[in-house]
């Protein structure tokens, strides 16, 4: 040791060169020697981490090449590196841990003056580097083993690392041991390094380390989020936590008890674990005197801790009945208790929890705003949002029934000409003459007036309100029927029909808008078909009464029908959406309370209406009619207009207006009046079939079935009339026209009859709903006028078969229109439909098989 010290002293003290030159040469020499030996110096300031996780890198131990390096934390976070280039006993290493005492006095071997890596360099006499012979021997050992690769990887990973080495007391101070000892040391090092890597999972790959760290941090954040933000959808559990918060003496006590409760209460989504939990819960029992919620909470808290451990159970060993019950329960659990770690979803869950009433009905009857988890662990993209309130059905039925009586009047007025024209053209009954041309105007003026009423109705429902506009049509309906009943000439009949048609246009516009804004999405399809059903009742009533009454008595009956409609309209409120649009928040709240029930929490729905109205106001234009031409508004308007076009050009009103005449021309062996009654009954019953199917099969499926049925029957009916006019005798097929008419009416009433009106109130945006509905209604009645006014001319020019074939071809084109353009609106709120139609949400697959919620009758 003394010889080496003398050489070091002599080398460091010779000459009078400046100290800086000596420092530079010594540093350069040490660098060159260190690089030759495979050693990488730590020269940058390495600040210590104040977190609990550090990146520890393994440096292979070599008692010859790698001297002891012991980083110590400087008060200024400077790592001091100590280089010892003298023969020492074998070294071992370990990562520098956070709990190490950095103020512990250094050992005797560590009491050396360090080289500072922070820009300044303190020089002390250092031992010379190993001789070339020693270096050569070490390189030979490198070539014999695979240690060289480990050294290179360690060299690359040393940057930025914090490594601490400590001396291993082996009891042997002689470093020049034999080769067997060296081999033993190398094997010992390999074993320790392998064990360290297995225990600490420390990778020399920085990307792997960062990936593992991110995974650890993500799991830690998730656990913290679930512990702090997790809100239980279980009503009893949530209420218990709220009571626990009040009773806890400190926040720590509350969080501790809550974590214990949540850890044992919430079940795993793993089916095997969930099934095991269910079995354990079913097997648990308590004393008979421990009943009620307190006993339930006590059982939740004092469950065995190992209850949540995964237990592998083969579902094949279970009974099939238990298996089905389990799968049903698990699906229910996933829908009602699946918690998303997304903060927005969790905030919505928290809001839903606040909505719950004392009995928790809101939570139990709701599907939450969550990304539901499928069996393969992937989230569904569709988020289905029904109401969070139980459906209070009676008030909504009363509202739908009230406006549907107006639809009954509309149906009666529309079908009036079919039985009335037969007696009106009879000079033995009528005191004035009605020519064929005048009769066509009696049938055609009503749709023309409805066109004007549809245009006028749009502004009226915006300024007067939906309810008041519907109510305003009741008295004119009575006046129009009295004008016809007391008519002494054709002019009075035409005036009465024009006034009735004008009211029909307004009513047909406002009825679907009112229902669309008052009933809940879960029953909108069912109750939305009530106006169509009552309209068909009005048609049937007109056909049946027309077979026994002349045109004047039939008009008096028409004057009596609006009376109950007028009375019931005074009992229902205005739509909450219209109140919100006028800034009448309190009246909107009262209307919602009336519609949803006094015990219902209407604040969330009211807030949704206000947000929707605010969006509509921000995007509103002074010229609403020009707003219709914007691209995002043109799409829903075009769909609505297309449905109205294909509805009317299916020829339905030509069939209804001239049913008796068509059966007479067909030469049917069945009485014409009886045929009209049969058609009316089928039309009425088919609507109720549609009511049952529309919220189960969906809108588009019913449109497909409706269109195909009409195409087939119209082509067959056209073939019958063609054969009758040009072909063989078809008198033995007198039943065929009635059969085709029944199937045709059945198909129309299932789909293209009610759905275009229903979807008009669904797909049109709120800010243009009044004007757009006005345009769609006017267009519908324009098409009705064209079809009814030109039907007789078509039969003369093309023959009856040509007219029916034309209607069938149009229906065939309508099938492709429905397939390509018409969206499915089943089970969606108006806000969701509007966002999708306006292009503000991405296209997502619909949630299948979600049934409507149970009713509180």
Swiss-Prot record:
Q: Name one GO biological process term.
A: D-glucose transmembrane transport
Q: Which domain of life is it from?
A: Eukaryota
Which residues in this protein are found as Phosphoserine?
248-250, 320, 322, 845-846
**Name of the protein described by the UniProt record:** Facilitated trehalose transporter Tret1-1
Originating species: Drosophila sechellia
The task this protein performs is described as: Low-capacity facilitative transporter for trehalose. Does not transport maltose, sucrose or lactose. Mediates the bidirectional transfer of trehalose. Responsible for the transport of trehalose synthesized in the fat body and the incorporation of trehalose into other tissues that require a carbon source, thereby regulating trehalose levels in the hemolymph.
Could you cite one Gene Ontology molecular function of this protein? D-glucose transmembrane transporter activity
Spell out the family assignment given in the record's similarity comment: Belongs to the major facilitator superfamily. Sugar transporter (TC 2.A.1.1) family. Trehalose transporter subfamily.
Recorded hits in Pfam families, A to Z, give:
Sugar_tr
Q: Where is the composition biased (Polar residues)?
A: 171-181, 330-341
Coding gene? Tret1-1
What InterPro entries does UniProt report for this protein, alphabetically?
MFS_dom (IPR020846), MFS_ERD6/Tret1-like (IPR044775), MFS_sugar_transport-like (IPR005828), MFS_trans_sf (IPR036259), MFS_Trehalose_Transporter (IPR050549), Sugar/inositol_transpt (IPR003663), Sugar_transporter_CS (IPR005829)
Q: Which residues are glycosylated?
A: 428, 550
Q: Which residues lie on this side of the membrane: Extracellular?
A: 414-440, 495-497, 550-552, 658-673, 722-740, 789-801
Q: Name one GO cellular component term.
A: plasma membrane
Start-end of Basic and acidic residues biased regions = 134-143
Signal sequence coordinates: none
């Amino acid at each position: 040791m003394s010889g080496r010290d003398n050489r070091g002293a002599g080398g460091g003290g010779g000459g009078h060169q400046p100290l800086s030159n000596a420092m530079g040469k010594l540093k350069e020499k040490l660098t060159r020697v260190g690089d030759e030996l495979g050693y990488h110096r730590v020269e940058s300031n390495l600040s210590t981490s104040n977190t609990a996780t550090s990146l520890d890198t393994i440096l292979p131990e070599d008692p010859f090449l790698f001297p002891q390096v012991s980083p110590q934390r400087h008060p200024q976070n400077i790592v001091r590196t100590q280089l010892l280039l003298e023969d020492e006993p074998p070294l071992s290493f370990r990562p520098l841990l956070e709990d190490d005492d950095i103020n512990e006095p250094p050992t005797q071997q560590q009491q050396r003056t360090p080289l500072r890596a922070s820009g300044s360099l303190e020089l002390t006499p250092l031992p010379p580097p190993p001789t070339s012979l020693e270096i050569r021997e070490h390189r030979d050992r490198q070539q014999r083993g695979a240690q060289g690769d480990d050294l290179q990887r360690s060299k690359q990973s040393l940057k930025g690392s914090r490594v601490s080495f400590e001396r291993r007391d082996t009891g042997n101070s002689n470093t020049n041991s034999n080769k067997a000892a060296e081999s033993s040391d190398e094997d010992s090092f390999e074993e320790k390094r392998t064990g360290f890597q297995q225990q600490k999972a420390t990778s020399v790959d920085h990307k792997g380390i960062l990936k593992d760290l991110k995974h650890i941090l993500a799991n830690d954040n998730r656990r913290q989020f679930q512990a702090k933000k997790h809100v239980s959808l279980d009503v009893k559990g949530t209420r218990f936590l709220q009571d626990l918060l009040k009773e806890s003496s400190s926040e720590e006590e509350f969080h501790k008890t809550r974590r214990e409760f949540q850890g044992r209460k919430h079940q795993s989504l793993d089916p095997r674990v969930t099934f095991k939990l269910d079995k354990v819960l079913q097997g648990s029992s308590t004393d008979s005197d421990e009943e009620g919620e307190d006993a339930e909470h006590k059982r939740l808290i004092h469950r065995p801790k190992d209850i949540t451990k995964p237990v592998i159970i083969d579902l094949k060993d279970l009974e099939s009945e238990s298996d089905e019950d389990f799968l049903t329960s698990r699906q229910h659990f996933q829908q009602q208790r699946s918690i998303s770690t997304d903060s927005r979803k969790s905030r919505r869950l928290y809001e839903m929890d606040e909505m719950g009433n004392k009995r928790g009905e809101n939570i139990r009857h709701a599907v939450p705003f969550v990304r539901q988890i499928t069996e393969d662990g992937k989230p569904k993209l569709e988020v289905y949002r029904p109401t969070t309130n139980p459906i209070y059905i009676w008030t909504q039925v009363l509202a739908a029934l009230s406006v549907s009586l107006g639809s009954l009047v509309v149906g009666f007025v529309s079908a009036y000409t079919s039985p009335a024209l037969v007696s009106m053209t009879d000079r033995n009954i009528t005191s004035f003459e009605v020519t064929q041309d005048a009769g066509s105007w009696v049938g055609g003026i009503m749709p023309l007036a409805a066109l004007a009423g549809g245009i006028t109705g749009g502004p009226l429902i915006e300024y007067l309100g939906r309810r008041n506009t519907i109510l305003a049509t009741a008295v004119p309906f009575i006046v129009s029927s009295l004008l016809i009943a007391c008519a002494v000439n054709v002019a009075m009949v035409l005036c009465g029909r024009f006034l009735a048609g004008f009211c029909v246009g307004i009513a047909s516009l406002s009825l679907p808008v009112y229902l669309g804004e008052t009933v809940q999405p879960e029953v909108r399809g069912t109750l939305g078909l009530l106006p169509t059903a009552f309209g068909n009742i009005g048609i049937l009533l007109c056909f049946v009464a027309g077979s026994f009454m002349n045109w004047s008595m039939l008009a008096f009956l028409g004057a009596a029908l609006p009376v109950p409609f007028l009375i019931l309209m005074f009992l229902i409120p205005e739509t909450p959406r219209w109140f919100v649009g006028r800034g009448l928040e309190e009246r909107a709240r009262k209307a919602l309370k009336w519609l949803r029930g006094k015990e219902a929490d209407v604040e969330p729905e009211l807030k949704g209406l206000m947000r929707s109205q605010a969006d509509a106001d921000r995007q509103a234009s002074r010229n609403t009619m020009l707003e219709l031409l914007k691209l995002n508004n043109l799409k829903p308007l075009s769909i609505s207009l297309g449905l109205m076009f294909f509805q009317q050009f299916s020829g339905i009103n030509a069939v209804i207006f001239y049913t008796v005449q068509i059966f007479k021309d067909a030469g049917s062996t069945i009485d014409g009046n009886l045929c009209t009654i049969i058609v009316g009954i089928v039309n009425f019953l088919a609507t109720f079939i549609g009511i049952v199917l529309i919220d189960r099969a969906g809108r588009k499926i019913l449109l497909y079935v409706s269109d195909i049925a009409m195409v087939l029957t119209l082509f067959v009916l056209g073939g019958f009339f063609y054969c009758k006019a040009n072909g063989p005798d078809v008198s033995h097929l007198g039943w065929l026209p009635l059969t085709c008419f029944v199937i045709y009416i059945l198909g129309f009433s299932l789909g293209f009859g009610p759905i275009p009106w229903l979807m008009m109130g669904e797909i049109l945006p709120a800010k243009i709903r009044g004007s757009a509905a006005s345009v769609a209604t006017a267009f519908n009645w324009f098409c009705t006028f064209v079809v009814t006014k030109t039907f007789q001319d078509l039969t003369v020019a093309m023959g009856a078969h040509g007219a029916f074939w034309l209607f069938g071809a149009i229906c065939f084109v309508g099938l492709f229109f429905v397939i390509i353009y018409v969206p499915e609106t089943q089970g969606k709120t108006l806000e969701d439909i509007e966002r999708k139609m306006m292009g503000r949400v991405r296209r997502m697959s619909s949630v299948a098989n979600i049934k409507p919620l149970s009713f509180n009758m």
